[in-house]
Regions:
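Enzymes and membrane/adaptor proteins characterized by extended Gly/Ser/Thr/Asp/Glu-rich
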Residues: 2-124, 143, 148-164
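Phosphate/pyrophosphate-binding betaalpha-module
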Residues: 132-141, 167, 171-177
């Protein structure tokens, strides 16, 4: 079915979100060979490819990495994540999470965040992104304009950020700058 989409609509990219690393590589090689234009391959890999693929050793969750005080170590971890993604044929990681975990009632961010302060989230996420870039992987910080101080699961509904423009600019948007 995917091969038909590639041929019929000349799609430019794919996102993978489940399976195993061997099958993933086989599919990607097949799809790339079939496409006349190289496909941009993406994955939602906030804590490495183990977030989506089975039988892969996971990296620590962002909440754990939020406690690491060594930016060079975080950058090295980000690079290892990126190298793992690159080996599988991934070019683009929908990560890191730039949400500031400031709402205990938030049902979805929690351990996906690097912390509860804008400074910590900015610092930790930047090092992880730089590591990915060192490995040649594109990144996309999420969830713009901030999902850390909401009480809804964005996989089930559309959360809203009901703060003043000043607050959103000072807090929620800070890691995106």
């Amino acid at each position: 079915k995917t091969l038909d989409l590639i041929q019929k609509y000349k799609i430019g990219g794919l996102i993978f979100s489940l399976g195993g690393p061997v099958k993933q590589s086989q599919w990607l090689n097949s799809f790339q060979a079939y496409s006349k234009t190289p496909l941009l391959i993406a994955m939602d890999a906030e804590w490495g490819v183990a977030m989506r693929l089975d039988s892969v050793k996971p990296f620590p969750w962002p909440m754990t990495l939020g406690a690491v005080k060594d930016s060079l170590l975080l950058r090295a971890i980000g690079k290892r994540m990126g190298e793992q993604e690159k080996r599988l044929g991934i070019h683009y990681s929908f990560s890191p999470v730039l949400d500031i975990n400031t709402n205990a009632k938030n049902p979805i961010i929690g351990n996906r965040s690097y912390g509860s302060s804008k400074e910590r989230v900015s610092r930790q996420a930047l090092a992880i992104m730089q590591g990915h870039h060192d490995a040649g992987i594109l990144t996309s910080g999420k969830h713009f304009p901030g999902h850390g101080d909401t009480a809804q699961d964005s996989h089930k509904t559309l959360p809203s950020v009901n703060f003043s423009a000043d607050r959103i600019n000072r807090v929620e948007l800070s890691p995106f700058k």
